[in-house]
Amino acid sequence: MKYSTVFTALTALFAQASATAIPAVRSPLAPRQSTTASCANSATSRSCWGEYSIDTNWYDVTPNTGVTREYWLSVENSTITPDGYTRSAMTFNGTVPGPAITADWGDNLIIHVTNNLQHNGTSIHWHGIRQLGSLEYDGVPGVTQCPIAPGDTLTYKFQATQYGTTWYHSHFSLQYADGLFGPLIINGPATADYDEDVGAIFLQDWAHKSVFEIWDSARQGAPPALENTLMNGTNIYDCSASTDANCVGGGKKFELTFVEGTKYRLRLINVGIDSHFEFAIDNHTLTVIANDLVPIVPYTTDTLLIGIGQRYDVIVEANAAADNYWIRGNWGTTCSSNSEAANATGILRYDSSSTVDPTSVGVTPRGTCADEPVASLVPHLALDVGGYSLVDEQVSFAFTNYFTWTINSSSLLLDWSSPTTLKIFNNETIFPTDYNVVALNQTDANEEWVVYVIEDLTGFGIWHPIHLHGHDFYVVAQETDVFSATKSPANFNLVNPPRRDVAALPGNGYLAIAFKLDNPGSWLLHCHIAWHASEGLAMQFVESQSSIAIGMSDTDIFEDTCANWNAYTPTELFAEDDSGI
């Protein structure tokens, strides 16, 4: 076996309508498959899914449900008051979070997205969805599409070949940090039984002005501490001593109500700008059954570390004394700052009529910026890494007028009007240097895999949540020491390592991820700290380039979106002033 690795080190470069936010309500996601199937999914048989089960290899097999689920999303400028402070925001259909998109494993999704913003393009990414056979719908401006121009509509179409918990969000600059996100839940089997599905619970930090107003300050170096946190789009901010007319009060805590003896499935999602949470519910144990879109062997914990973009599905049994309990976000104060870090809380009640605050005491948080231990994240479907290939790429850093991050000595800077996939469709083979393209092509029949190593050489000690589009990846190493191209690969875990689509790059360490070259496309890899992505901490893999154009099915729609964007840009009020993502 020839061992090779894609190696990248990380350095830093300094280069000078009205709607009220509402928390997502409980939505018991009842199984929708036929009850005449061989194995019905129920509270006592969650591993079943008709003719399929939790043991089915979903990378190779997708149910043919014959069902198409259609949704309409309007991207809007709105005025919202999620925590008692009124501010402008960007919303899907007027709310933060946006409406839930749900489907069953194997369903086809058709989602019409209309851009009703006055002065911005947009695009929607379906986080964690591999987009097999639908690469042009990954939703990244400058990579897989041109932005959707104001007044234009783009219809995204893809099949749900995976199942579990994820989210959709704008990938146009910093828009998701201004409210453009919502839950995407694909029903399927699970590794443990439960009675009720609570649905998505979002954790995030929240500013009291648009992040675009903060951007000029943020890119000068250390990002500012934001004013508050939200849990499922709501929280309380103390306006009692404020003279600010926008501080109107009236916020509320996110609440859950449990019935004693019932087991609940919670779908936890960190959609923060610059936040790391350690979720917990006082006096309750979390049974973790999935990370990102990968079912895992269940394990129990008192607290759960959740990086930006990551999702965990947990089961919580209502077995405590009937009382009120704090639901704790547990802000990672050693990872980033927030003015109301201690306020990242919600309330669990056993009596829905109760209105008093809990007096419960939580466990001591671990207080780390890391992921959950890799030893805990064991995929239920056991898969190994095969023969892989190597590319070594070094980096450098420089200082100019403002802060940017670099990968391979280059900070990502995309041209929204000329996405990578369009260049490939037009038979272009040379890409701009600041597109940060790494070509991946299988040249040896025994090397179907690539291992990509990203190493933090900045000395800052910041942990970065790294997200790859187009693939679940295998976490073969996640270390706080220095990577050695000659020695470190010998310690890679190639036997059923954790699989997911977001994993933390340790500060001053390295992250090694493996994935199979089985999905031709232009796939973005980036830090999911919003400031860092805008500051260029990203690159893209052009995988199996010769197969990309022939894999595109809706080329007319793809080209029409670019034509409409190019017709709009001469009147564009706000020019691109970040990486584009």
Curated annotation (Swiss-Prot):
Family annotation (PROSITE patterns): MULTICOPPER_OXIDASE1 (PS00079), MULTICOPPER_OXIDASE2 (PS00080)
GO MF terms held by the record: copper ion binding; hydroquinone:oxygen oxidoreductase activity
Cofactor note: Binds 4 Cu cations per monomer.
Superkingdom assignment: Eukaryota
Mitochondrion listed as a keyword: no
Reported induction: By resveratrol and tannins.
Membership in a protein family: Belongs to the multicopper oxidase family.
Binding site for Cu cation 3: H171, H469, H526
Functional description taken from the UniProt entry: Lignin degradation and detoxification of lignin-derived products.
GO cellular component terms given for this protein: extracellular region
Reported cofactor(s): Cu cation
Compartments where located: Secreted
Signal sequence interval, chain numbering: 1-19
Binding site for Cu cation 1: H125, H467
Keywords: Copper, Disulfide bond, Glycoprotein, Lignin degradation, Metal-binding, Oxidoreductase, Repeat, Secreted, Signal
Binding site for Cu cation 2: H127, H169, H528
Alphabetical list of SUPFAM superfamilies matching this protein: Cupredoxins (SSF49503)
Residues with glycosylation annotation: N77, N93, N120, N232, N283, N343, N408, N427, N441
This protein's name: Laccase-2
Annotated Plastocyanin-like domain residues: 74-191, 197-353, 413-547
UniProt keyword tRNA processing present: no
Residues bound to Cu cation 4: H464, C527, H532
Intrachain S-S bonds: C146-C562
Catalytic activity: 4 hydroquinone + O2 = 4 benzosemiquinone + 2 H2O
